[in-house]
Regions:
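Active-site helical microenvironments for divalent-metal-assisted chemistry
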Residues: 2-188
Length: 188
């Protein structure tokens, strides 16, 4: 009998499978449709893949909300997906859910520029998918601003603040895509 470690399952397949398990009872916030949260997971991962990011970054994109929304620990992510994926997920997770929404968002933006590029890319892909969801909601499901506890102006300001911080980064097509997605929402 071999004493070697068992092979690790394919990273992306495993990331999507576990994201589906962990997000199983979660839905997007569309006002009139129950869209499974996996739609967002797939959207974020797809954006990262389309921009040529490494498999570990795409996997972290698929898992980007599991620490803050599902209570999954960094150690659990390390065990299943390795240190790099777990660290990227930690970088994009809000550290203290006991703070107010405003304080969490402010702190996240303040620390955006100190994060590794791959974590910044996951954040941008996450927000691109959120912006695209606002457009889809406006076209197919009704008033998109009903999805948010805070109104349109607060949300737009938050997205614009991220665009300003992203503009300080070296040029990348992902940043350009973020700007286009934001412009589409502002035009609604």
């Amino acid at each position: 009998m071999s004493t070697s470690n068992p092979p690790r399952p394919p990273l992306l397949k495993s990331a999507f499978d576990w994201a589906a398990v962990w997000h199983k009872n979660q839905y997007r916030k569309y006002p009139v449709a129950l869209v499974p949260y996996m739609s967002h997971v797939a959207g974020v991962a797809s954006i990262l893949s389309r921009h040529g990011f490494a498999e570990e970054v795409v996997a972290a994109g698929a898992l980007h909300d599991v620490m803050e929304d599902c209570g999954i620990t960094h150690d659990e992510l390390v065990k299943r997906f390795g240190e790099r994926v777990a660290d990227l997920v930690r970088h994009v997770s809000e550290p203290d859910k006991s703070l107010s929404w405003e304080d969490r968002k402010r702190l996240y933006l303040e620390h955006f520029s100190t994060k590794p590029w791959e974590a910044q890319a996951i954040t941008l892909a996450d927000k691109i998918d959120n912006l695209e969801s606002i457009v889809v909601c406006a076209v197919s499901h009704g008033d998109p601003w009903k999805m948010f506890k805070r109104g349109r102006d607060v949300q737009i300001t938050r997205f614009e603040e991220l665009a300003e911080r992203a503009s300080r980064l070296p040029s990348h097509p992902l940043i350009d895509e973020y700007r286009r997605a934001l412009a589409s929402v502002v035009a609604l």
